[in-house]
Amino acid sequence: MILFKFFLACFSQIKSVWLTFINIFSKRETRMYPEESLSLSSRYRGRIILSRNSFGKERCVACGLCSVVCPVSCISLKKSTLKNNKWYPKFFRINLSRCIFCGLCEEACPTLAIQLISDVELSEYKRQDLVYEKDDLLISGQGKYLDYDFYKFSGVEVGTKNKGELDFESHPIDVKTLLP
C-alpha cells in the first residue's frame, strides 16, 4: 500500500512537470494591456458622459429619469429653469464608485443626453476623485447620437397632417373594432 502511494505521488509529480512543459510552447492568454489594445464589444458600456446637441447646447433637461431609474442611486441632480422656461441641470453629479454601468440611465433619458461610451480607463487613487460633476461629464460633441434635438420633436405640431399620416407613424387603432 505504501509503495502504491509512492508511485502515485511520483506519477502526479511527473504529470505536473509534463503539463508545465507542454504549456510553455502554447499561446499566452494574458494580454499586456497598455502595449496591446483590447478588443471591446460594440455593446460595451463604459464611462458616462453628457452630450450636447448640434447647436452646442447641453441636451440634459433635468427631468430626473436617470436618477430615478438608477438601481444604486449614484446619480444626483438639481433642476433649474432658464428665461425661456426650458429646464437645465443646475448641478449633475455621478458617483462612479457606486455605478454598476448597467445602462438604465442611458435608456431612460428622453433627450439622449446621458450616454455610456467605450472608455475603460476609470481608475483613480482616491475615492473622492470618482465623483464626477457636470463639467467633468459634459463633452463638446454629440456623442453616439448625431443630429438629435429633443425640442425639435417633442410637442411640435406637424401642421395639417392627422395622426398616423406621417411616414414614421402608424395609424391609430380603434379599440371598438377589437371587441367581439
UniProtKB/Swiss-Prot annotation:
Binds 2 [4Fe-4S] clusters per subunit. One of its GO terms (cellular component) is plasma membrane. Residues 51-80, 90-119 form the 4Fe-4S ferredoxin-type domain. Keywords: 4Fe-4S, Cell membrane, Iron, Iron-sulfur, Membrane, Metal-binding, NAD, Quinone, Repeat, Translocase, Ubiquinone. One of its GO terms (molecular function) is iron ion binding. Its cofactor is [4Fe-4S] cluster. It is an enzyme of class 7 (translocase). It is found in: Cell membrane. It is a peripheral membrane protein. NDH-1 shuttles electrons from NADH, via FMN and iron-sulfur (Fe-S) centers, to quinones in the respiratory chain. The immediate electron acceptor for the enzyme in this species is believed to be ubiquinone. Couples the redox reaction to proton translocation (for every two electrons transferred, four hydrogen ions are translocated across the cytoplasmic membrane), and thus conserves the redox energy in a proton gradient. HAMAP family: NDH1_NuoI. NDH-1 is composed of 13 different subunits. Subunits NuoA, H, J, K, L, M, N constitute the membrane sector of the complex. This is NADH-quinone oxidoreductase subunit I. It comes from Buchnera aphidicola subsp. Baizongia pistaciae (strain Bp). The gene is nuoI.
